Amino acid sequence: MAKSGSFNTSKKTQDYGDLYLTFAWSIKSQDIASNKTVINWSLKGAGTTGDYYYKAGNFKVVINGVTVYSSSTRIELYAGTTVASGTATIAHATDGTKTFKASAEAGIYNTAVNCTGSGSWALDAIPRHGTVSHSLKSKTETTAVINWSSDSTVDYLWYSKDNGSTWTGVNVADGKS
């Protein structure tokens, strides 16, 4: 599964090279409780060399269906110049999986949009169920000692000594045995 990604927009060819933009992202954090991933993203100028720059405007960045940046202002772009950057929060499906799409566009040497690009990535699934393991340590005719452990997604462990008629909860929010 992807932890980062990037794409280049289509190119505008000039005498001194192809001009385009590069969109890049990387995971900042994942939150199990909220079932969401936060990514860092950036949009940068690319394709020029040395002191060359180009005018570009009508920028737009869409991440997971949400417009995170939009500007009609025309600016001078050198290779590596950051047009915009930020974070975006992406909600996962109820089973913890998520594939998201990002797109970017701009007008390079044009007022109208003439360079576009997009990409799609599958994020690491966020666990939506806890894992508990157990084993019998010892037993007698009247007692049994059970070893158990849980992962960090488990808050409470419930057990029954009467075949499910009543249950006892143990706070295991620290995920320890």
How would you name each of these model-derived features?
Residues 163-167:
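Asp-box/BNR beta-propeller loop motif
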Residues 168-175:
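Short beta-strand segments within Ig-like beta-sandwich modules, predominantly Fibronectin type-III
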Residues 28-34, 135-142:
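Short, solvent-exposed loop/linker segments at the N-terminal edge
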Residues 38-41, 142-149:
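A short beta-strand segment in extracellular, disulfide-stabilized domains
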Residues 54, 141, 149-156:
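Short proline/glycine-enriched turn/loop motifs at strand-loop junctions of beta-rich domains
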Residues 1-127:
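Mature extracytoplasmic or otherwise solvent-exposed domains
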